[in-house]
Regions:
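Long, low-complexity, charge-rich intrinsically disordered regions
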Residues: 63-165
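Short phosphate-engaging motifs
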Residues: 12, 26, 132-133
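Short, cationic-aromatic polyanion-contact patches
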Residues: 12, 42-64
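Hydrophobic residues on short alpha-helical segments
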Residues: 2-5
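Short amphipathic alpha-helical interaction segments
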Residues: 20-36
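Short acidic, hydrophobic short linear motifs in intrinsically disordered regions
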Residues: 7-20
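Intrinsically disordered, low-complexity N-terminal regions enriched in serine/proline/glycine
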Residues: 19, 47-48, 96, 156
Length: 165
């Protein structure tokens, strides 16, 4: 639990407990115990941090990417924080995946970064603010696109193949 709080600062109780499928009640108890012992801290907005100094504000993009990770956590063998522009790297079903957030207005910049040759680049799960952004994106190795609602609900999309004339 502490490892996840350190990796992904600013997550909610619901997100942290979902890392432990079928043990969510135990995870909730552990979270309360760690909070009481002063090993973790909870901000006024209900987000958890490993120390008080880090509580400067939750990273909205990271939080949305964690919701995507949690959507298939039962298939994930390993996960960790990624290197920009990927927020999270994970192995699932023997494949490497990068979960990449693309905020509105940053499409061109991030697409250019992702088109640079990369050694061992995995499949990319692209998290967008709005499904309309998908048509603006040309991303190599994109396994799929998704949006995340405020409540953590993930909606998945595939980019339609372009028709040849």
């Amino acid at each position: 639990m502490l490892h996840n709080i350190s990796l992904y600062p600013g997550l909610t109780e619901g997100q942290l407990c979902r890392f432990f499928p079928e043990k969510e009640a135990t995870a909730k108890t552990l979270l309360a115990h760690m909070l009481k012992e002063g090993r973790i801290f909870c901000s006024e907005n209900g987000r958890y941090y490993a120390n008080q100094e880090v509580q400067s504000g939750a990273d909205k993009d990271l939080s949305r990417c964690v919701w995507v990770l949690l959507d298939f956590i039962d298939q994930v063998e390993y996960h960790t924080v990624g290197e920009f522009p990927a927020a999270i790297l994970c192995f699932a079903n023997g494949e490497l995946y990068e979960i990449v957030p693309i905020p509105q207005g940053k499409e061109t910049m991030i697409c250019q970064l992702l088109r640079q040759p990369q050694k061992d680049a995995g499949k990319r799960i692209v998290v967008v603010d709005d499904a309309a952004q998908i048509e603006l994106l040309d991303i190599p190795q994109a396994a799929g696109f998704c949006t995340v609602a405020e409540d953590g609900t993930v909606s998945n999309y595939k980019k339609e193949a372009e028709l040849e004339s």
